[in-house]
């Protein structure tokens, strides 16, 4: 959906840019939409430096197209996410979002995938436009920890990319990887576990505890040969 929104923004801006699957997969190594625009421009026009105003305007077009596309299509959570949210809330565990995307994008997405009151499910929501540095820098996670008033070792991050994993580890937070299409080939060394979807694992509290050290992972499906 993001790739389609970028391409729609390029057309609207009168640019002959087009990001196909392979191009976008490569660009995802750079975190942040505005940063990807700059990276692509540098690779295609190395002697041209886009001004901040041009990059911001182009990214704003992309954000509008993303919101439109999300509203037009059925957007579902990844398998296991809904039950994870439900079970965590039932146990009284705090949930937070630490993302490199913008606040606007996350609102567009979760308003459709959950509902308009999605923010009530999360104790903290930190987006890429809330911090100075994006992943793989740990800034979003450090801000989440500050808002939650929790120790990093008491938390668990769920990520899908090497950059996200690096950010969590740099913040001292153990991480579980839920693989996604664009990042399947990333190096996930250092993750607690790597799964294709979250229905493969259950997070089972021991003795009713709420902290990570009082929990264990329980495999709920056979091992797969990756």
What residue spans do the PLM features occupy?
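A metal-dependent, Asp-based hydrolase signature
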Residues: 27-69, 79
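Short beta->alpha linker loops
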Residues: 1, 32, 53, 76-80, ...
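Alpha-helical elements of Rossmann-like donor-binding domains used by nucleotide-donor carbohydrate transfer enzymes
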Residues: 5, 23, 36-39, 61, ...
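Extended hydrophobic secondary-structure segments that form protein cores and membrane-embedded regions
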Residues: 24-25, 56-59, 124-128
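Asp-based, Mg2+/Mn2+-dependent phosphohydrolase catalytic module
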Residues: 82, 86, 102-104, 108-226
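Short, acidic loop-to-helix structural element flanking the phosphoryl-transfer center
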Residues: 67-97
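Short, surface-exposed alpha-helical segments at coil->helix boundaries
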Residues: 3-4, 34, 103, 107
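Active-site neighborhood of HAD-like aspartate-dependent phosphohydrolases
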Residues: 1-23
């Amino acid at each position: 959906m993001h790739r389609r929104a970028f391409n729609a923004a390029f057309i609207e801006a009168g640019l002959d840019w087009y990001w196909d699957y392979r191009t976008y997969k490569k660009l995802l190594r750079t975190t942040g939409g505005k940063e990807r625009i700059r990276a692509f421009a540098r690779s295609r026009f190395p002697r041209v430096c886009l001004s901040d105003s041009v990059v911001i305007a182009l990214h704003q077009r992309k954000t509008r197209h993303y919101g439109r596309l999300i509203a037009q299509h059925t957007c579902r959570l990844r398998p296991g996410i809904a039950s994870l949210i439900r079970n965590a809330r039932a146990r009284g565990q705090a949930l937070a979002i630490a993302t490199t995307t913008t606040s606007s994008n996350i609102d567009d997405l979760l308003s459709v995938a959950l509902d308009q009151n999605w923010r009530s499910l999360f104790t903290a929501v930190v987006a890429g436009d809330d911090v100075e540095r994006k992943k793989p820098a740990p800034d979003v996670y450090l801000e989440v920890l500050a808002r939650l008033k929790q120790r990093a070792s008491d938390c668990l991050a769920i990520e899908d990319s090497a950059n996200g994993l690096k950010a969590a580890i740099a913040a001292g937070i153990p991480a579980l990887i839920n693989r996604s299409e664009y990042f399947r080939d990333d190096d996930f060394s250092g993750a607690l576990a790597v799964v294709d979807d979250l229905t493969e694992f259950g997070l089972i509290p021991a003795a009713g505890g709420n902290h990570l050290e009082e929990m264990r992972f329980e495999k709920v499906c056979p091992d797969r040969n990756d």
